[in-house]
Regions:
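C-terminal or late-domain output modules
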Residues: 166, 175, 390-425, 796, ...
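Extended amphipathic secondary-structure runs
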Residues: 133-153, 266, 352-388, 749-796, ...
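Conserved small-residue
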Residues: 36-117, 612-770, 814-815, 825, ...
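Extracytoplasmic gating/loop element in the C-terminal half of outer-membrane beta-barrel translocons
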Residues: 62, 299-302, 307-318, 324, ...
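Short Pro/Gly-enriched beta-strand edge/turn motifs at strand-loop
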Residues: 121-128, 417, 762-766
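Membrane-proximal, glycine/serine-rich, low-complexity loop/turn segments characteristic
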Residues: 6-269, 277, 378-379, 504-520, ...
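Short, glycine/acidic-rich beta->alpha junctions
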Residues: 1-4, 13-17, 137, 174-177, ...
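Extracellular/periplasmic, surface-exposed regions of secreted and cell-surface proteins
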Residues: 183-192, 198-202, 239-293, 303-333, ...
């Protein structure tokens, strides 16, 4: 239920629509019991070919480190490469192409120490070989018993899910869920019916705990370069300080959830057409999260090594790369010291447990009366109320310094113990009424009124009225339409308007609360506590109002093609946002209040075709398409294009228009005393030193920081010059002030006294434009369902037509942090680069015909040369085959002999095919950010794609009914 009128009786929880789910009930066939079993076994594999850079990544990092000097001492994080070792890396890939991925780390073959004591990695490692299983398995079973006896029907169902995770080295990486449900309905007599239900669900998630922070193993899989060893053991049998070994040795964390729901209800029918319903539901959720720490002991490959002696005799290893490093045919054997790299009391030297319990009481009461005035006039009256009370309590405990990491217990830890707790509650209540009028099945009218209250607002502002109305006209039921029914089988037009209250905000926005903290000074032998000054609050916070107007049409052609179309406009008024107009001298953050508003315009289309052919083939086709655009209509006095200014399109992305990559011909050159070609340096309009550009090429010095802005080189991006002070290109790429120019308001003397923040007269953004939008646009799907002589086929596609994303991670930005080394293959293989020989004289590898700019190291984020531009935007549009199911139901004449009512076998595939425009990046187009993973925006530093890869699954199942 999407429009405000139809969703209104559900109150505040329906602010963004309602999905109605009807629980299974017992069979309506008298004195009959059906037993149904459904089970499947599933295999999960990678959803697409994930490729991280190997040799091409080494090439990129080296090229990025030698942009200016042409050679480098070394580049990398803990494990290095330079112009000397690079040829050895290249040769290794051919010489040891068949080396098993788990071959131990071997000195002289996989790495060597150079004359400066740096670990030069020659062997390359594919993280997916070490971290991801070739396949994981799951099983799902469901059993239900449904039946009836007399006026009573019942349904009992049981379910079990067992799903393995994807981490190859983990001791335990899995998820299990058990659930049970029972529902009973009985009609006592014509006056009274009663019902009851009980639901229970238990789930357990186990995973390797590699860190107590918001980072997990994938953060380091997608961080270090391909020559950083992630093989689990070295040649001496020591575990290595690698992601693989840490996951293997990590303690097993567990997350458990128990959900119980019990409901009872009754329906009283005093007279015909009058029903009175009472329902009560109690739901309780308990959760536990246990994190046992561990101590990591093994070869610390991050840091230095020592010479290896046996009985006092120095051992030597064969140096397979002497032709390149010149260190000799044999070199002193190196061995990493076996050490504990877990910091005492650090991230994994602790034990943690949290528990929470949440209760929800839901009360519903409605009465409905149907009044048939005559054959053409029908009226339905409904009155009702609903109330919800919610309360939750939580507790966490943590203690550091484990005495025995193999037996993590609070009583066996000796460090600091920390405890904390939480308690929250809220409640809502509402009263509503609805009147439906139906004239001759042609004209339909509905009116609703709600009176809602919420504990989240001050006493005087808790309660609000919310009305809604709708009307429909079944045009096809008019007498004059009869002749058209051969073509237009049915036609209905409708409209609705309504207002629903939204209270999806925190519980204490209007209450000034003081936070307690521990002081750092000691008094009377103990640390003092102190309370901070409360934040400023607005005492008049109340409901956010969501008003929706909807116009729709439903029609059917030839009794087989059904079309539904809706256009809607949804306005969120009194939106709770920070207060406007407070100066810096206010002293604290502006309090939030009902100061904002936004507006969404959208439409939805669904087309369905269904037909039964003479040969018994049943075919059903369904396609959907929807789009919506949201605009900020009121948000204080912000004038920054990066902020929430009035008139901003939600999700808009500002940046430059990419023209092409710079070439030698775009610069003015000269030669130095030795005859080497060098740039001519000049000054721009603001007296900044820049490399002189050829005639007609815009300068881009303003995009770099500092006074020396001459760093633009061949292979760097050239942006389009689209703006100047007179409105025409001016030969310089500039950023402007980044502000919105609102219409000024003048006094009688012509002085600006204020601004009209509803009228935008322009933008001071230099050569930037809106280059994309992060909001999903043109969401679509289509489904094919077919059935023929026991065979059934279901195909479901889903996609997004347009969506953009700005990259902010190793996997989404070329050169994000190339000194660490990790990057996707597509970035490394398709970037502009030059690699010189050890002397820095001759180019030994290059890629001038590239898609991405010159290899550079951004040091952890895009900036300067690779600022926001339309060439770097990720195209997140996609088409995915979400499900393909093929089944066969055996003929009853065969199964009934075994007392089987129905036997169906099927094959089902999820995420079987994905078509996207991500150029081979190892991220999933449906995962826009990683905030969802643990409900925390800082998970893995909010880096896109830094998590377990997406999988496809293939399942084989059976459905049995006795």
């Amino acid at each position: 239920l999407k429009d405000a009128a139809s969703a209104s009786i559900y109150g505040a929880k329906a602010a963004f629509g309602v999905i109605l789910i009807t629980s299974k009930k017992g069979s309506k066939e008298a004195e009959k019991v059906n037993v149904t079993y459904s089970g499947n076994v599933s295999i999960q594999t990678l959803a697409k070919d994930y490729q991280m850079a190997g040799l091409s990544g080494i090439t990129y990092s080296l090229a990025a480190a030698t942009v200016s000097a042409k050679t480098t001492g070394a580049v990398g994080a803990f494990w290095y490469v330079n112009n000397v070792s690079y040829p050895a890396v290249v040769e290794f890939q051919n010489k040891y192409a068949d080396l098993p991925y788990d071959s131990p780390l071997t000195y002289g073959r996989d790495w060597y120490m150079d004359e400066n004591g740096r670990k030069m990695g020659v062997r390359l490692y594919d993280p997916y070989d070490y971290m991801v299983k070739d396949a994981s398995f799951s099983q799902n079973h469901a059993l239900s018993v449904a039946g009836s006896k007399g006026n009573t029907n019942f349904n009992i169902s049981l379910g079990y899910l067992d799903q393995d995770g994807v981490l190859k080295p983990a001791k335990h990486d899995d998820y299990r869920r058990w659930n049970a449900n029972i529902r009973v309905n009985t009609k006592v007599n014509d006056f009274l019916a009663v019902r009851a239900g009980l639901m229970y669900s238990k789930s357990d998630r186990r995973y390797p705990l590699t860190s107590f922070s918001n980072l997990n193993a994938w953060q380091y899989v997608y961080r270090w370069g391909p020559n950083f060893p992630i093989v689990a053991y070295d040649e001496f049998g020591q575990g290595t300080r690698s992601t693989t070994y840490e996951v293997q040795e990590a303690g097993t964390a567990s997350m458990g959830t128990n959900y119980t729901s019990a409901n009872v209800g009754t329906t009283i029918t005093p007279v015909e057409n009058w029903d009175i319903n009472f329902d009560y539901t109690f739901a309780e959720t308990t959760s536990t999260h246990f994190k046992p720490g561990t101590h990591y002991v093994g070869a610390d490959v991050w840091y230095g090594t020592g010479d290896y002696y046996v009985d006092g005799v120095l051992q030597y290893a064969q140096n397979e790369w002497n032709a390149y490093n010149g260190l000799g045919a044999t070199i002193p054997m190196q061995k990493f010291a076996s050490s504990k790299w877990t910091t005492v009391g650090g991230l994994t030297d602790q034990i943690y447990q949290s528990t929470s319990i949440a209760n929800r009481h839901t009360y519903n009461a409605t009465t409905t009366y149907d009044w048939d005035i005559n054959d053409k006039n029908n009226v339905r009256f409904m009155l009702g109320m609903n109330a919800v009370a919610y309360e939750s309590r939580g507790h966490t405990s943590k203690r550091t310094i484990l005495s025995d990491p193999n037996n993590p217990q609070f009583s066996l830890a000796t460090g600091t113990q920390t405890v904390s707790g939480s308690h929250s509650w809220n409640s809502q209540a509402g009263f509503f009424g609805r009147i439906n009028y139906n004239y001759d099945e042609k004209y339909l009218l509905e009116a609703n009124i709600r009176y809602d209250g919420s504990s989240k607002f001050p006493a005087a502002l808790k309660w609000r009225w919310f009305p809604s109305f709708s009307a429909g006209w079944r045009v096809s039921e008019e007498d004059w339409f009869e002749d058209a029914k051969d073509v237009v089988s049915s036609l209905k037009v409708r409209a609705s308007w309504g207002s629903i209250g939204d209270q999806s905000v925190s519980n204490s926005l209007y209450i000034p609360t003081m936070s307690q903290s521990g002081a750092s000074w000691v008094r009377a032998g103990a640390l003092d506590n102190y309370y901070a000054t409360p934040a400023a609050v607005a005492s008049d916070i109340t409901w956010q109002d969501i008003e929706t107007i909807d116009f729709g049409v439903d029609f059917s052609l030839f009794n087989s093609v059904n079309v539904t179309f809706d256009w809607y406009k949804r306005n969120t008024n009194n939106m709770i946002v920070p207060g406007p107009g407070l100066g810096y001298n206010f002293g604290t953050s502006a309090p939030s209040g009902n100061y904002g508003s936004l507006s969404t315009n959208g439409w939805e289309l669904m087309v369905n075709y269904g037909h039964m052919f003479d040969n018994g083939l049943s075919l059903n086709l369904t396609a959907t398409l929807a789009d919506a655009v949201t605009t900020i209509t009121e948000y204080g006095t912000s004038t920054s294009v990066g902020g929430w200014y009035n008139g901003k399109t939600y999700g808009e992305i500002w940046g430059y228009r990419f023209d092409r990559l710079l070439t030698d011909e775009d610069f003015v050159w000269t030669t130095d005393a030795e005859g080497n070609k060098i740039h001519v340096v000049t000054s721009d309009s603001k007296n900044r030193q820049i490399n002189k550009m050829a005639e007609g090429i815009a300068t881009q010095g303003e995009l770099r920081s500092g006074t020396q802005r001459s760093g633009w080189l061949p292979g760097d991006p050239l942006f389009k010059d689209i703006w100047g002070k007179d409105g025409t290109p001016d030969g310089e790429i500039t950023a402007g002030t980044g502000t919105v120019n609102f219409k000024p308001i003048y006094d009688a003397e012509g002085n600006v006294v204020d601004y009209d923040y509803s009228v935008i007269e322009g933008y001071d953004v230099g050569d930037r434009e809106v280059i994309g939008n992060s909001t999903p646009r043109y969401e679509y799907s289509f489904r094919v369902d077919a059935d023929w002589k026991g065979f059934d086929l279901s195909i479901f596609f889903q996609g997004i037509g347009k969506r953009d994303m700005v990259g902010n991670a190793f996997l989404t930005v070329p050169g994000y942090n190339s000194s660490d080394g990790s990057m996707p293959e597509t970035f490394a293989a398709n970037s502009w680069y030059e690699i010189y020989d050890a002397a820095g004289k001759q180019v030994v590898a290059s890629n001038y015909d590239a898609k991405y700019p010159r290899a550079r190291n951004w040091g952890g984020g895009p900036s300067t040369y690779w600022t926001n531009n339309d060439h770097m935007l990720l195209d997140m549009s996609y088409l995915r085959l979400k499900n393909l199911t093929f089944g066969y139901t055996l003929p009853k004449k065969l199964t009934q002999k075994a007392q089987i009512e129905k036997l169906r076998l099927y094959l089902s595939c999820e995420n079987l095919l994905t078509f996207d425009n991500l150029d081979g990046l190892p991220i999933d187009p449906e995962v826009y950010s990683d905030a969802y993973t643990y409900g925390n925006d800082s998970f893995n530093s909010s880096r896109q794609g830094v998590e377990a890869p997406a999988f496809r699954s293939t399942s084989f199942g059976v459905q049995l009914t006795f």
